[in-house]
């Protein structure tokens, strides 16, 4: 079956399907949750409208709202490179995510891309969505929004299917757009579509076929994205700024640094005093600092298949803080006073932790 997608706006013509879609998704919400946290309904309705109108062909940065806890803090997990129907320890990582997520009382989960292997989703009806997502991440603590970006493997499938808000009829946790912003009060999270930056996917795709619908003309798409990101970062009034993309900027892993992102994206992050850049792509867990900026580079790409050994060869050893070539995930806890990151292995053991106080961030910025 072939699906035809058009840029969607909430108009009179689209009101009826939107209302049907909203009622379906709303019926899956926990009434107990809404009873105790009625403000969540406001956020839910607003976000649903934005998501429903988001799968356009532009690089426009849509904004979603994510409430913090009553104490003002925000906690979330980060996982990348995972969708393999539970194989390569994906199910075991999911189990530990559920346990850590409960301990931390997380507000949401972030996926750094390569959500469905090997070649994304084939359609809205691809069973891979439920086999690799819904039926794997079943813990109560993981029944929260999953804010997701696309990876290069996702671009080998039907991109519009994975971006479609209609997937929320199957699992209302799923939130996937090309590039977007989540405003979580004390922290702003900027999700960036990094795959179109990488030249080799266009010049030397080998046997792979990429779905570039909505991206071409490429240069216009990238210019618009970089411009909007720069403006959004500059205008952010949040205490903390975190940027999420699939591809590495700095990495000691198999893929190493992404030259195109070093050239085009990194200067914008440096100029706007971003605190973290979080990515997947390399199937490992790692933390790299920076000698010339405030940015910390965190890789969380150990959601399933990992690449063992032989990859650590970073050209700036003084920046290398942590590298682990196995499966796992990371957590982030944000408060007014500090930003805290923890890496976990497939057994839930803490491998590495790092924190920065807001005073330190101000000192470096000055």
Curated annotation (Swiss-Prot):
Residue positions of the active site: 255 (proton donor)
Gene name tied to this protein: PAP3
Carbohydrate-modified residues: 89
GO CC terms of this entry: extracellular region; plant-type vacuole
Pfam families, alphabetized: Metallophos
Native organism: Arabidopsis thaliana (Mouse-ear cress)
Annotated positions binding Zn(2+): 114, 152, 246, 281
Subcellular location: Secreted
Protein's recorded name: Purple acid phosphatase 3
